Amino acid sequence: MSEKKSMLDGEKQYHIQLKEGDIADFVILPGDPGRVDFIAQHFDNPKEIAFNREYKTVTGTYKGRSVSVTSTGIGCPSAAIAIEELANIGAKTLVRIGTSGAMQEHTRVGDFVIANGAVRQEGTSPQYMPMEFPAVPSADMVLSLIHI
């Protein structure tokens, strides 16, 4: 308990170099740090908060709501580090964005796709949930993303 408390007492998280108050409770997660500024250009008053290793963070507002964007690097282990540290300092809703291939001919490069599930064939997520637990977003999240 005291270890968790010390992580929240104004100390920066080791990898992301952020502390409580640096981020919004809604965080967008691209993999590539180069995409952070591309996303943040849509914010009002974007401010770079930290850039350490593959973890770059900008916080601003979008349509009147405080939003942060933090890059996670490549792969599940580095994403898990970012997500755990962001959760330690107040992130409540995290949305992973990125590129993907398409299996349907009608899906074109640049199309916006909201996944309603994912295959968990990697080694990180079983450390958090049994493989039988489905990797699906909440219906509220999907509907919110559709309306953005």
Could you tell me what each predicted segment is?
Residues S2-S144:
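Metabolite-binding pocket within alpha/beta catalytic cores that recognizes anionic/polar moieties
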Residues I146-I148:
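Conserved small/polar residues in nucleotide/adenosyl-binding loops
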